[in-house]
Amino acid sequence: MKEKRMRKWCCYITTTILLMFCITNIYAQEFNKYFIDRTLRIDYIFSGNTKEQHISVDKLNTSPRWYGKRQKLSNVPIEGNGQIIVKPHNKQEVIYRNSFSTLFQEWLSYDEANYSTKSFENVFLIPMPKDSVDVTLELYNNRRETVVSLTHTVNPNDILIRHIG
């Protein structure tokens, strides 16, 4: 009787472990389909005042390993004042999304932003794509309306992407 229970218990544990590996593998395939285990650092400049805002790309760097999320890549758990969205080049499928809030957007709420123009550096980390992607950066107002956005293409083979680390 004890031996039968022990076998049942071992079978249950083995099945559970196998299911966990299968589920992990399914999520890993989504990451591995579009990305490699490297980080792409994109430096942006946000500039402007309360009347107009601008986003420009400053530089791109890549470093070893990706330490961010590998599952639910297009889900955003918490909404911020902006989002970075990654799609395969010329396609509509979102393969990575993350939200953020910036000091620039906070500064826009101060009186100084009514009569002065400033610029702020911002850095975003995304997994390194295998192929060319379109990266969209959107900034929202307090009503969740897009006030400024920038879409640019990143080719992972671009010689201007600096390798660091």
Residue locations for each model-derived region?
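Non-catalytic propeptide/linker segments at domain boundaries
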Residues: N114-G165
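Residue-identity detector for glycine
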Residues: R5, W9, G48, G68, ...
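N-terminal prosegments of processed precursors
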Residues: A28-N122
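Bacterial Sec-dependent N-terminal signal peptides
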Residues: M1-N32
